[in-house]
């Protein structure tokens, strides 16, 4: 579920978050079953499919709302993420991913939900999202529920 979290503005809109003064990050809320996929696997996919080393930027998208972050819900997630980040830091560029507790998640507006499937031919989807999805399918096919 796409949404916003990590900031101080209550019930933010996309416009609020885009201005950069809400403190929120554009996020995806992931609900998972540890029996089906491990938190370690989720961390592996997360760090492999975006740039965790550049502050306030993902590709051509620039702004505080694009910063890399893990908003954990239990201490075990925090500890696992800290260890994962430590290993990444020791083997490459410094990771700038924020790590903090999730306080409140605000669901994004309806037009952001299933955005890619509804707009797959749009230039942004073709240039930015499609290559990331192909990388995800190629590298992590065994973890994907519906890989076709």
Feature locations, PLM:
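Flexible coil/turn and secondary-structure edge motifs
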Residues: 1-148
């Amino acid at each position: 579920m796409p949404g916003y979290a990590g900031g101080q503005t209550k019930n933010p809109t996309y416009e609020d978050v885009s201005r950069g003064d809400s403190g929120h990050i554009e996020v995806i809320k992931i609900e998972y079953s540890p029996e089906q996929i491990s938190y370690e696997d989720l961390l592996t996919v997360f760090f492999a499919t975006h740039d965790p080393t550049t502050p306030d930027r993902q590709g051509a998208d620039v702004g505080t709302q694009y910063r890399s972050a893990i908003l954990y819900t239990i201490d075990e997630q925090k500890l696992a993420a800290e260890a994962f980040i430590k290993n990444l830091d020791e083997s490459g560029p410094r990771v700038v991913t924020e790590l903090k507790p999730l306080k409140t998640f605000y669901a994004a507006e309806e037009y952001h939900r299933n955005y890619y499937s509804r707009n797959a031919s749009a230039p942004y989807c073709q240039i930015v999202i499609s290559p990331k999805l192909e990388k995800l399918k190629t590298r992590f096919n065994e973890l994907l529920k519906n890989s076709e």
